[in-house]
Amino acid sequence: MRVADFSFELPESLIAHYPQAERSGCRLLSLDGPTGDLTHGVFTDLLDKLNPGDLLVFNNTRVIPARLFGRKVSGGKLEVLVERVLDDHRVLAHVRASKAPKPGTELLLGDDESVKATMAARHDALFELHFDDSRDVLSILNDIGHMPLPPYIDRPDEDADRELYQTVYSQRPGAVAAPTAGLHFDEPMLAALREKGIEMAFVTLHVGAGTFQPVRVDTIEDHIMHAEYAEVPQDVVDAVLACKARGNRVIAVGTTSVRSLESAAQASQNAPIEPFFGDTKIFIYPGYHYRIIDALVTNFHLPESTLIMLVSAFAGYQNTMSAYRQAVAEQYRFFSYGDAMFITHNPMAEQEKVG
């Protein structure tokens, strides 16, 4: 399967650099998976598309201010993007510098260079950094870090991004990118969903910087996914099984919720889904058999990305690419701060030919 089959033309003007004034004020493109029919509307229309007893599964990860600027004590400037917090004083990070730091290199981090760290070891593309500070890592990041806006948002981060690039229900610090489908849900919207009898459950997947890495191979099957830590606790498993038993739908809010639930289903030995705690490298592309998800709320994704492949596996390749062409023609806003889609599962998608 060719990566190029998932390309589409996107004018630069359709990339959203700021969110809407109101979280739930974005547009919503609804795609009926079985028929391919498209409906244009606004995000609050989602209320009318869900039935009492349906289950929304959110990702409650919280974005950390993971981007740090500084220099080596010896002089060279560098940029650090924390990928994973290992403990109170150690992180794994990407480091951009004219010359990669060697183990033992001392760093001065923060706009005022007030925080000392040491490069302890290298693990392939990642660097293990040890912070020489009495504060824990999360406190340091909150004090001196910048919000890690995606590379396609071509502007410096602003103070407002600490709130805007964060879901209102985020609880578990650890992500370096927001689960962006969740950005559209505000408190009034959540209250209205509860009022209608919509059930809610929360997984955790700490989104890594790898989510923005381009696919660097020509053939999809040759791509190796990055690892991300996910948790699907017992209460989520119980909610999913109860939802299925009563004939309702499991609706994932975002591709990270999809990957969490489907990882738990893949790893399950004795039931459709069991609790899951660990790293996942699940790669969902056309031909994949969905085990849990019945519908999906998601944003518009980058051309040739693993996420548009995931959507194509869910809705069907032709349906997905046609919907994206229509979204461009209708000038929907794309990517993290952009508009949303509501998609129902196409059971024929896994048999469909791509290209």
Swiss-Prot record:
Biological processes annotated in GO: queuosine biosynthetic process; tRNA wobble guanine modification
Catalytic activity: 7-aminomethyl-7-carbaguanosine(34) in tRNA + S-adenosyl-L-methionine = epoxyqueuosine(34) in tRNA + adenine + L-methionine + 2 H(+)
Keywords, ordered alphabetically: Cytoplasm, Queuosine biosynthesis, S-adenosyl-L-methionine, Transferase
Pathway(s): tRNA modification; tRNA-queuosine biosynthesis
InterPro entries tied to this protein: QueA, QueA_dom1, QueA_dom2, QueA_sf
Assigned GO CC terms: cytoplasm
Location of this chain's protein in the cell: Cytoplasm
EC number: 2.4.99.17
Domain of life: Bacteria
Annotated disulfide bonds: none
Quaternary structure note: Monomer.
UniProt-recorded name of the protein: S-adenosylmethionine:tRNA ribosyltransferase-isomerase
GO MF: S-adenosylmethionine:tRNA ribosyltransferase-isomerase activity
Function text: Transfers and isomerizes the ribose moiety from AdoMet to the 7-aminomethyl group of 7-deazaguanine (preQ1-tRNA) to give epoxyqueuosine (oQ-tRNA).
Ranges that cross the membrane: none
Pfam families tied to this protein: Queuosine_synth
Family according to the record: Belongs to the QueA family.
